[in-house]
Amino acid sequence: MMNNFSKIGFILAALGSSIGLGHIWRFPYIAGTNGGGAFVLLYLFLALTIGIAMLVGEMLIGNKGKANAFKSYENLDPSPSKKWRYAGLTLIGGPIILSFYAIVLGWVFYYLFMVSFNLPSDMESSGVVFGELYENGFVPQTLGLLFVMGLTGWIISRGVKRGIELLNLILTPLLFIIFFGLLIYAMSMDSFGKAVEFMLSFDMQEAKKAFTLDVFVDSLGQVFFSLSLGVGIIITYAANSDSHQNLLKSSLWIVLSGIAIAIMAGLMIFTFVFEYEGVVNKGAGLIFVTLPVMFSHLGILGNIIAFLFLVAFSFAGITSTISLLEPAVMYMSETYGWSRAKATWSITLAIIALGMVIVCSICTPAADYLAVGGKSLMDIIEFLSANFIMSIGGLLAVIFIGWVVSKEKLESYTAHFFGKLGFNVWYYLMRYITPLITIIILLAKIAEFFMGEDAVKSILESMGL
């Protein structure tokens, strides 16, 4: 079962896991509203330092542990008690995230098949279309969840080589081709320059926004989420990679390619938004409300562009769903001796069950009973998994590499891709800087959870941060 990825297959699979829905619809917005080019530089700096350091660290755990996340920690733990194996249990974050992620991806498929060639022509009607799906669409949301999880389960059940690698060898390059083609078209539009200015300008007054603590924490959180850190994905994929894989080069490819996709998507999206004076917002509102109206102004060409955009978006989503499911499947297969099919479909059914509860919490009369503090169950699970499970998982990984595995072992593990200076920089980051920054993120998110985002921002502003 081990060493099933080819070298390029491993990079594309890890890249596919990182280029998800949130990376495409969230990064452009926070870049444009938090300093533009200055924020992009800040994000690049953090991704190329902290991000790559953590990627290499998690890859090492899997590449040298050669097992599921739980067992990989155990195999590398030098202590007799082997208690660090429990750090691998953060892989539970994958199925939890997938329970709501599959629902959102189901919305993408709904728009792909039902809306892309019948686009709403104004913001009001577009809001009604999405509102009807979100608040009253129990049947389409259920069908979307079943379709996404059925497709994900089928791919995973085929194995690493015939399932995960084959899918990513096809979809990840196609994703780049579609986005690049759409970007070329966007460059011919009058508003392309405005989109470039919105995302990449270096206005010093606006740049100050990128250097406040809350934006710094937000950008670090985006690094975590966009690189699939903390939930066993990277460890699991690396366990199936070649023992002599250049993990530094692989990490660079993943980070830079992810940034390229995010910037291409952002420039393309905001060109259309500015061309037709749409509303600059983020998340579902941008993708499912604003963009359909913008595309509708182009007639049949807009229908084609909308279709291609949603195809690319669905590609990004499905390469992420398989990465969220694989760590748990590998764990159950290796720990309990289950066949790959049994592990895949058992976990898939459990995710569907949780997903159905979430669907009920947003579009049935049960919504009021499943809400906590005015937040839907979907919002709560999304916030907890993205901000706590991933942060805790990432923190455990960096502490394990920086403080548990011996420096001598790490030097031998990384000798084929790190020189002495490179190793010392990486080791210093993993031992001191990255754990401290991860703790700051975790504390900030805990404060936000209990006090609210606005209250935390007010406190930071009063402190001059």
What are the roles of these predicted feature ranges?
Residues 1-25, 54-59, 63-88, 242-246, ...:
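Membrane-interface "cap" regions at the ends of multi-pass membrane proteins
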Residues 6-46, 232-238, 248-252, 256-259, ...:
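Transmembrane helix-boundary motif of multi-pass solute transporters/channels
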Residues 9-11, 17, 142-143, 257-263, ...:
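Loop-to-transmembrane helix boundary motifs in multi-pass membrane proteins
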Residues 86-93, 336-348, 382-438:
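C-terminal membrane-solvent junction of multi-pass transporters and transport-like membrane proteins
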Residues 105-136, 238-244, 249, 253-260, ...:
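Helix-loop-helix connectors at the membrane interface of multi-pass transporters/channels
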